[in-house]
Amino acid sequence: MKFTQTEKKQLMIYVIIAYGITYVLGLLMWYGYGKGLDLSAFPNAQMLYPAAGVMMAYLITRKGDKNLPKAFYIFFVALTAVLVVCTAASVLAPKNIDLMGTPFSQWMLILQYVMIGGSVIFWILLLVSGKEKRRAYG
């Protein structure tokens, strides 16, 4: 199977985002594990990396495509970046709060609120993008 230049570029962008960010934050995870910190924020952010990699690849390589739901893709990549920052902060500046007698990571709480708000905005952006764009890019 022979790949075009665009496909090679898309694959490289995907690999850098989906696996590169995972590797770099894995080092933070290792550090946090050694310190006994709460690492529950990591999987919440990590589940978005593959989709963010695909969306970033499309944003970079298909700039002229009118069917590309750009607002949705840009917001998804931006939200993923915010979650990466929250995840890194949960290890670099850990802070626990007390919720009904149970210690809970402040960053995990912030991350959950960001994901809830982001999900609502995702639905709005997806509905506003129109049927044609949704059909073209799933």
What are the residue ranges of the model-derived segments?
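Short, Lys/Arg-rich, polar N-terminal cytosolic tail immediately upstream
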Residues: 1-8
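Specific transmembrane helices
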Residues: 8-138
